[in-house]
Amino acid sequence: MMAERRNGGKPRREKNNKTGGSVNERKRQTHSRKYDVTGGEKQIKTGSKGKNVQGKPRQAHSSQYKLNPNSKCPISHLCGGCQYVDMPYEQQLAEKQKYIDGLLGAFGPVDKIIGMENPYHYRNKVTAAFRRMKSGEIISGVYEEGTHNILPVENCYVEDEKAAAIIRTFAELIKSFKLQIYNEDTGTGLIRHLQIRVGRKTGQIMVIIVTASPVFPSKKNLANALVTAHPEITTVVQNINMKDTSMVIGDRNQVIYGKGHIEDILCGKRFRISPGSFYQVNPEQTEVLYGKAIKYADLKKKETVIDAYCGIGTIGIAASDRAKKVIGVELNEAAVHD
């Protein structure tokens, strides 16, 4: 399985909180940091509430980065999520096998890694950030590793291709609907993120528009325009996140179009997925993993299975046919409801 993207403080694609390092003063500091791969220098602000507290990288406004034209992904050296993207997949697996052997080999034999048939475009949840350029152009993309500087992404080799197309359309609609993009430094603007969740087996797609305010002008017209361009979309939800946080999804949802959730099938079981619910981002490999775990558990339909931190209960429900009883333990009420 390919490495997931790390988005500089955003959960990964819940894929990974990078920070600007420890800070020792209560006041906010500004640091200059040089990146050899860019040939430029970026200003990164980090906030602190006390000693030895990890500061959250704030928005970096420099666009001085260099693409790598010799790479399959021209920004892989900057986003930090796909360090192995230019390796043949068999070599990727060999490198990961070597790493796992080094970690666990002293404790016993290590089985061979089970690879994917198609290790590309597997990710069923995609999160995009946006920025308005001085020219007025809206770019969408991911955060450069360790910063909140947005790197434009046209095609990501781990993300669902339909999700990528929807994100491109939404960036165009931001401009045509004259919506303001949220600025982390000033706390102004409306659009924080766009998150796409895809049911790989059902084909259902949920679009989550994360806003900094519940007031969202023309949201129904915007949703209609998005669905017209992409009729495969089954629901559009406004998620409201008014906090000064690096977390993408807030606590409040307002359904704009459709049911407000999607469904997918995993291990032969049907699951409901809401905006705040955790669901494995690589469902193909998840089925392989769960199948192995259930096989090794060797259940005889006499046991009680406790699915701790269960989310929407995928592991416990997948094992339910072989257990006498399944108990799921979860704090997230939305996940329990699903």
Please give the residue ranges for each predicted region.
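Residue-level signal for inorganic ion chemistry
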Residues: 82, 194, 236
